[in-house]
């Protein structure tokens, strides 16, 4: 997994979005890696708690607009459905999930944090849904 790292210690899995140069923006590769990471922690009976966080100065600064811009309607819908599937998976996970928000949690990042059972935010954390101002 290139964009998501999983570390496990003392029955805790830490899932880290690792694309700090892009403020951990969500694209297909990140979603794919995140699905693999969720498969791993859900199946591991030694993991009791899952913490989701972001590397660098952002939790997740939303979707990767550069990847989304050229998408046609069908591609955009598929991307949205993939994101929604992941959000529902985190929301319905039997293991407790904690969002450790260390910076920007915008758009899909805010949604992912809200999908977790508990949110812990640093003083530098910023939550928002900037896309509501579009259109």
Regions of interest found by a model, annotated:
Residues 86-94, 100, 106-135:
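CoA-thioester-processing core
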